Amino acid sequence: SAICLICEIAAYAKDNGMTLYDYLLQIYAEYGFQRETTINVVRPGKTGAEEIQAMMLNFRTNAPQEIAGEKVVKTKDFKTLIQRELINGEWVEKPIEMALGATSNVLQYFTENGLKASVRPSGTEPKIKFYFEIPVATEKGKPFTGADYERCTAEAEAKVPAIKASLGL
């Protein structure tokens, strides 16, 4: 379970003279920084459910060309199991391999700078959910400090309004 994994990580950090926070900063220094955020758009009632279906259909048939000024270079549709990637100016389709051919009503968009936006309707509530993974450029290998964490977090959060506007939210 997740608690066992975090205990293993904490033990590793302690054995190496670090706190969990120190270890997280080391991970950012090695792999770069990324901020995740979720936006929920609630649409109650029967008309809300219809709006959510229409939104998903629109995103599926009219994929954004850019998000927050960044060109979309790859899309994944886990309902149709089709991935489209922009290669040399042409969109190339290929199948998404899923265990047992399972599908899900999820769409993902990837930009040229590594931003990822995922969208799916909630299975239990009258809402559509948007998940954003926002990378922030760092100098790989350079020590990453608490001040770097604060700066990168603020930079990523500052991009959220433009991302939302690009998706019509």
Describe every region a protein language model picked out.
Residues 123-125:
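A generic beta-sheet turn/junction motif
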Residues 1-120, 138-143, 149-169:
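Phosphate-binding and adjacent anionic-ligand microenvironments
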Residues 117-119, 128-134:
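Short, well-ordered beta-strand elements
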